[in-house]
Amino acid sequence: MALLVEKTTSGREYKVKDMSQADFGRLEIELAEVEMPGLMASRAEFGPSQPVKGAKITCSLHMTIQTAFLIETLTALGAEVRWCSCNIFSTQDHAAAAIARDSAAVFAWKGETLQEYWWCTERALDWGPGGGPDLIVDDGGDATLLIHEGVKAEEEFAKNGTVPDPTSTDNVEFQLVLTIIKESLKTDPLRYTKMKERLVGVSEETTTGVKKLYQMPANGSLLFLPINVNDSVTKSKFDNLYGCRHSLPDGLMRATDVMIAGKVALVAGYGDVGKGCAAAMKQAGARVIVTEIDPICALQATMEGLQVLFLEDVVSEVDIFVTTTGNKDIIMVDHMRKMKNNAIVCNIGHFDNEIDMHGLETFPGVKRITIKPQTDRWVFPDTNSGIIVLAEGRLMNLGCATGHPSFVMSCSFTNQVIAQLELWNERSSGKYEKKVYVLPKHLDEKVAALHLGKFGAKLTKLTKDQADYIYVPVEGPYKPAHYRY
């Protein structure tokens, strides 16, 4: 593939769409600063001691204004950073340009092909002859996946000389992963093994990536220590819930200018993301239907006044479909053919397999009309009616808008900073086994406390007698690990 790494005048590598947007990106990064108190507090607390000085951190996470602030927090604490996006549509090009010019190696642009996406991931992991990164910040697990698959292939190659066969799978993305590894074996048959040996650990941002990590210790395939950032309360109950409540209608209105009030909206899944999406649609005046497999989540939905029904029973009545499940094959092409004309179909789960895009793209005679980037009308030949699909079935809030606002991302990214510090500081202590960990409750409460001042909130203080009465320390933590917020 004819992509070339470029370099700044200082020698830092990058590949972005347009470096002339760097000044614009810098202005928006400065604007975000006021809305990210947790990251600012992290810089103030840890900056003087440079706790990750010398650490090489590879990050696979949406390249946005908000993540730009995370990058510059990590570099302010002493780290070197190489960055790629975890989604082909989510990069904000002005943010990428500003960071590439000023702070870190960036390989990301909006509208990457899948081949370009995996090239960027490979570049972010490439730290030269010294091996790979010391730490990874991952979102969805793609950087983690590439290393694990690379090590597996290198072990097979060393044992019996076999190389990966990209034609062995029908999954287009996995074909590209196997192709990268196959080419790597020609130049360095121990490339990913050396990465594994250097790596301290990974902090994983999202539900989908965390699910993958929890499977690995059971089958013995986990190669390095992971911290599950997603299940910190100050991530999942804020980013996933309130972030989606903000960014779903933003993406819908930017992409389609649709009036949500009076429409029928279906939200597939009623976890934290689904709850935020359903609340957004209800608050905007839509009648909301939920599909759900879990009876507890379904009961929660009914208590919020929502209907819980089968997709098949209402598919022809719904105006707006939103998938939030993290699963696959939720809305299939047969469902789409039964939808009303110009029904909107979108996804806010991490990957693009909740909506059957392959079935839609290969449906005989279907016609794709691109209205604007990431907004396509697909017309079926037998009915001459169509549906509107956003962001090609990928994350619509980042593909069609700018994702979650800075404040709620400050909560998530403060957890990421703390997780990276914990991994690095405890790298030789033997504190952690090779299994998935969640940050302790007192750190979760600390992240929340750092964000209260922005709203002028004041915390009531327990007396010693009160604390003893409910069996908690005066300074917290105030809830047990199993408490459900």
From Swiss-Prot:
> Which catalysed reactions does the entry list for this protein?
S-adenosyl-L-homocysteine + H2O = L-homocysteine + adenosine
Instruction: Select a single GO molecular function from the record's annotations and give it.
Output: adenosylhomocysteinase activity
- Cofactor list: NAD(+)
Any single Pfam family the record assigns to this protein = AdoHcyase
Gene name tied to this protein:
SAHH
InterPro entries in the record: Adenosylhomocyst_ase-like_sf (IPR042172), Adenosylhomocysteinase-like (IPR000043), Ado_hCys_hydrolase_NAD-bd (IPR015878), NAD(P)-bd_dom_sf (IPR036291), S-Ado-L-homoCys_hydrolase_CS (IPR020082)
Q: What does this protein do?
A: Adenosylhomocysteine is a competitive inhibitor of S-adenosyl-L-methionine-dependent methyl transferase reactions; therefore adenosylhomocysteinase may play a key role in the control of methylations via regulation of the intracellular concentration of adenosylhomocysteine.
EC number(s) per entry: 3.13.2.1
A GO CC annotation recorded here is: cytosol
Task: From the UniProt record, give the pathway where this protein acts.
Answer: Amino-acid biosynthesis; L-homocysteine biosynthesis; L-homocysteine from S-adenosyl-L-homocysteine: step 1/1
Any single biological process term in GO: S-adenosylmethionine cycle
Q: How is the cofactor bound?
A: Binds 1 NAD(+) per subunit.
- Residues noted as binding NAD(+) in the record, renumbered to the chain: 206-208, 240, 269-274, 292, 327, 348-350, 397
Protein's name in the database:
Adenosylhomocysteinase
Please name the top-level EC class of this enzyme. Answer: hydrolase
Return the similarity comment. Answer: Belongs to the adenosylhomocysteinase family.
Which SUPFAM superfamilies does the record associate with it? Formate/glycerate dehydrogenase catalytic domain-like, NAD(P)-binding Rossmann-fold domains
Keywords assigned: Hydrolase, NAD, One-carbon metabolism
- Provide the binding site for substrate: T64, D139, E205, K235, D239
